[in-house]
């Protein structure tokens, strides 16, 4: 019996069903860990526990040569790029690593790198889930990274922070671009399957008309691609405007008075910015009410859209410059 390629609705439903079962496993793990270890330990090791259950799910299904529950639900099977035989053991292992382990490692290492850079640049210790600044053990690699970061200049550290932010945003952009391409040609729903060359064949023919379904998904892909390009243009335009605003601000700051009036000295001595640890100049308020220098909080929000003190979400557009603030 000749098997045809799985269509886009089958691939999407299969992935959604797998995510549903994985979410159920994570929920049960949440209850068990909270019952035996407490909420604090669960929050500390939440990502690692979820990774363990995701790996267990795919090792018991894909790695062992069986269908996942989602694949079984829509009657599709994995095949290699030739579409004549099942993927090899190496391909299945690579698929599991790229789909579960690699995103976890990238996210963890990028967060840790940002953590190190912000500590060195601003002197502010950031509390983040899974990262306690005083308790996590440094590996030999991160000791070397820490020494390299400490040897950088302040400008180099700020540039590296922006580079890390751009890389993380680029990964998210790549995922959305890949999803739009999937809607248009329907080959690979996940990036990991594209990298490993794993396709799907359906065991039995679907009842619907594939041509009508494909046309609707192609239209959805075109709309998604247009929206993504529009979003990219807006981001680039916003970045250019921020760069111009920073240049104007630096020029204005050089032209401003170097010494505050006498009646402000006693107050200004107490009003210091917690980012630069200097006298707060051109006070700017976040939506949560904390005050910083305009330049300091603008640079912070351009790399991390949250308040440095209370971690509340805060974009650069929501900052309020306080004129004539005493």
UniProtKB/Swiss-Prot annotation:
Signal peptide: none annotated. SMART domains: RING (SM00184). Zn(2+) 2 binds at residues 288, 290, 307, 310. Gene3D superfamilies: Zinc/RING finger domain, C3HC4 (zinc finger) (3.30.40.10). It is found in: Peroxisome membrane. The chain crosses the membrane at residues 8-37, 39-60, 90-122, 148-185, 217-236. A zinc finger (RING-type) spans 273-311. One of its GO terms (molecular function) is zinc ion binding. It catalyses: S-ubiquitinyl-[E2 ubiquitin-conjugating enzyme]-L-cysteine + [acceptor protein]-L-lysine = [E2 ubiquitin-conjugating enzyme]-L-cysteine + N(6)-ubiquitinyl-[acceptor protein]-L-lysine. Keywords: Membrane, Metal-binding, Peroxisome, Peroxisome biogenesis, Protein transport, Transferase, Transmembrane, Transmembrane helix, Transport, Ubl conjugation pathway, Zinc, Zinc-finger. One of its GO terms (cellular component) is peroxisomal membrane. Pathway: Protein modification; protein ubiquitination. It is a multi-pass membrane protein. Zn(2+) 1 binds at residues 273, 276, 293, 296. Its EC number is 2.3.2.27. Residues 38, 123-147, 237-326 are cytoplasmic. It is an enzyme of class 2 (transferase). One of its GO terms (biological process) is protein import into peroxisome matrix. The E3 ubiquitin-protein ligase activity is stimulated by PEX12. Residues 1-7, 61-89, 186-216 are peroxisomal matrix. Component of the PEX2-PEX10-PEX12 retrotranslocation channel. E3 ubiquitin-protein ligase component of a retrotranslocation channel required for peroxisome organization by mediating export of the PEX5 receptor from peroxisomes to the cytosol, thereby promoting PEX5 recycling. The retrotranslocation channel is composed of PEX2, PEX10 and PEX12; each subunit contributing transmembrane segments that coassemble into an open channel that specifically allows the passage of PEX5 through the peroxisomal membrane. PEX10 also regulates PEX5 recycling by acting as a E3 ubiquitin-protein ligase. Belongs to the pex2/pex10/pex12 family. The three subunits of the retrotranslocation channel (PEX2, PEX10 and PEX12) coassemble in the membrane into a channel with an open 10 Angstrom pore. The RING-type zinc-fingers that catalyze PEX5 receptor ubiquitination are positioned above the pore on the cytosolic side of the complex. This is Peroxisome assembly protein 10-A. The gene is pex10.S.
